[in-house]
Amino acid sequence: MNAQESLRPLVHLPGVPEAVETARKAIDEVHEHPANRRGWATTAAEASVRAARASAAVAGGAVEIPEEGTVTDPLLAGSLRVAEALGPLLPTWQRAPLQALARLHVLAAADLVGADEQERLGRPRADEEVSSRLELLARTVTELGGQAQAAIPGPVQAAVVHGELLALAPFGEVDGIIARAAARLTVIASGLDPKGLVVPEVAHFRRQDEYASTARRFSSGSTEGVAAWITYCCRSLEAGAREARSIADSVRS
């Protein structure tokens, strides 16, 4: 069974088609904002920083970036490194997702381990189930970069990648930061938000209890749990589009 066949049933789960369409519309509209048509590099850069700050905060890190000096909080520093690397990593994500995930772990966790542990960064936990499910996820991502992409909406693709990485916690640390970054890569790669303007991470930060509980429901594998997670992710994308509009409005004013 290929990626398209395995994910197609998810597209038709209760509430998913409507949530996908609403998210798509919100993202399309923010891409038409005058600031995003002419100066999208500026708004995308601000979106990337806001995403990194929110993702670090969800993981328990600092939110604010010091006006002077360097970032000392290891989670925020790692999240900012991840954000800076997403653009260059996009081709690797589409071609060799496991390599991209390894790189994300190196960047996110670099300040959390001592010099004698640096070599283990980028290596998933030695667990047979983790290895097999990561391989399956990688095959799914690479297949979705081909013909299956048009058949499986970007919000569904991103929700599956995001939820599976949260459930697996493949590295044992900073897995949430990695999962959110991988979801962001998927949203961009799928063509849903090719400029990286949307900031769903802010919604995850503001709704942390719902985020965590719905992710657990996804990991259960139940039909209701998977549908709840996908629709939650769609609502977060919609909220992320509102955040993107606020960025664009501030740039234009």
What is the predicted function of each stretch?
Residues M1-S253:
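FIC/Doc superfamily catalytic core
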